[in-house]
Amino acid sequence: TWAYTDDLPSVKLGETDYTKTKPNGRHGATNENVKRYIDFAAENGLDQVLVEGWNEGWEDWFGHSKDYVFDFVTPYPDFDVKMLNEYAKSKGVKLMMHHETSASVRNYERHMDKAYQFMVDNGYNAVKSGYVGNMIPRGEHHYGQWMNNHYLYAVTKAADYKICVNAHEAVRPTGLCRTYPNLIGNESARGTEYEAFGGSKPFHTT
């Protein structure tokens, strides 16, 4: 689980006090775990480590159609952003940011400047963005024009901050990366992760 605690059936950003909760012991994005992966990356010639589940809000992030799930700048108590980035730098490795939006695109756009500035302030130069779930606002779809406009907005905004974007659950590549080379990837194919929840048919190719 990405969640930090099982004590809360729901969370409210800005109101939930995680310092008064008991960690569930299954939260992977901890200082200890991340340092271990940084060490592994340094020893094996890998230059970047992606860490998902580092920020508050994962307790009920999926399936509840909540407009405001993440603020993209508030870490769980067991994830020290400054210390981990300094540790990674000392090993010749960088951390990659993760922004799961829970398909609440309006919320992401409201927080985007603050989120990107947080990355710059803490030494991040790349982000994996995610869009799991049914789009908010309702009626929009992952591959519709409204979302294509959003993907363009996110990439151009990231360019202002000199940040690279790897968009997950995004539209298939359209050539946008020729104009904005900071768009380094679109994870849009039905890949191996589907084996965790239903799998893919034998005739499916990616």
Describe the function of each predicted region:
Residues 1-91, 99:
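Conserved structural scaffold segments of CAZyme catalytic domains across common CAZy folds
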Residues 53-206:
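Aromatic- and carboxylate-enriched substrate-binding clefts and catalytic-loop regions
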